[in-house]
Amino acid sequence: MISGFLHDIQNSGITLVDIGSSGSLDAKWTPIKDLIDLVGFDPNEEECRRQNNLPSQYRSSVFLPYAVHGKDGVETLYKTRSIYCYSLLKPNKQWLDRFAFHDLFDVQEECPISVRAIDQIEELKSYSPDVIKIDVQGLELPILSKAGRYLDSAFYVETETGFTANYEGETTFAELDRFMQANGFLMFDINPDHRISRNNQLKNKPTGREQILWAEAVWLKDYVALDRQGKFDELGVDQIKAKKVLVLCALQRCYDFGFELAEFFARKGLISARELAGLETADGWDLTRAYPADEPVAAPRSGKMAMLADLLGLLPDRLRDAIHRASAR
């Protein structure tokens, strides 16, 4: 069962690199929060200092004061009417003005800001990520194309990407999909429920069929395909790494893919036949079974709470995080 793997990886933990960090993670990470070593990036040095002085919610956490980019240098930060639309890319106003929320992207100030290429950040070099979470308003490709060994190490990548260029030069979902597949990743989850009304007299009469402008997606590495291509990293995936991968499959509830990987790892001698047998049923993948009955784990919501959760799900990650922080005060 997956519960045994949680014990086996306690000493190594699961390294999660959060580029565009808000300081905390979604509730979906709760079942493994005590295993997570969080490395967050926020260009606000004061906020990083504040976060680093707080007790960690996870196994460990550190926040680094860098604006991550595809290169070292100085770029322009476009400060918009809404802080949640700030970007190192200029808003594509000709396009955005067609939508009801266009005023959120009105540029109020342009400021120079130092940026760092991810492969040049010294403090990150001692880490081998298992998870990369990236929310950077259109800079996914410049950053991930420089991620090198970090992307090689990662099994799980979470992105938030536009289907169209909401910013000038923005990475679009189609471009990201090609890049991720070329690097051995497949999409396993998507939340496209970000529909925005056109800026006309019908904007306050939504039908739920408005245009989808962006989506969060989860990408998992396909070790089976990489092995068939002669690209499987025999040295980079040891017994502990294999068990981390399977725990992440359990967290994502990708039991079928997880079992395919478990069979692959068993053939490679990375898990035992007994461990494989423990994963042959859905119950064997259930992370909630790894906790005592009195220990809370994120549970399904119903009624009004479910409706509220669905409404919050329509908001960008950073805005949701701000609401959660405000409600906790």
Identify the residue ranges that each predicted region occupies.
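Phosphate/nucleotide-binding beta-alpha loop and adjacent structural elements of enzyme active sites
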Residues: 1-329
